[in-house]
Amino acid sequence: MNIAFFTRPKQEITYLYTDYTVRQALEKMHNSSYTAVPVVDREGHYVATITEGDLLWFIVKGEGGEPHTMAIENLEQFKLTDVGLNKFKNQPISISSSIEDLIIRSMETNFVPIVDDRGIFIGIVTRRSIIKHYYEKNILPHE
């Protein structure tokens, strides 16, 4: 079994582009009900995972870094790159990585971004899909 078995392709999930505005990101996340989503550049490379908290703290810090100084209308002026994406928070793994690497990484986060050998984002593996698979394979048959 390999990582591709668990991977949900990017066509089936919500992700954002680095040039989206903060408003666009909030709308897309709200419509999908996800609290964290992958961010990719226009060439398709995985850049980071952004959370509702990242966006909230960007708004709260305001334009000058002072609390409560950002007007809602200004959310259209700022791109996701202005938010300060944390590229180390949810690093991707390669589609050719081992299942062991996938499981270890999934213990730290709700989903693991998957990239090809060129760093192109191809999808995610959710912690839920891993747990469900192992439950159905190892626990359910014994009940």
Regions found by a protein language model. Name each.
Residues 15-33, 39-41, 59, 91-109, ...:
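The conserved cystathionine-beta-synthase
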Residues 13-16, 46, 74, 90-93, ...:
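Short N-terminal micro-motifs specific to bacterial/archaeal maturation
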Residues 1-13, 75-89:
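Bateman (tandem CBS) regulatory domains
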Residues 34, 46-63, 108, 121-139:
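Short beta->alpha transition motifs characteristic of CBS
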Residues 12-15, 53-63, 87-91:
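Short, mixed-charge, low-aromatic patches
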Residues 51, 56-81:
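Helix-adjacent hinge/juxtasegments
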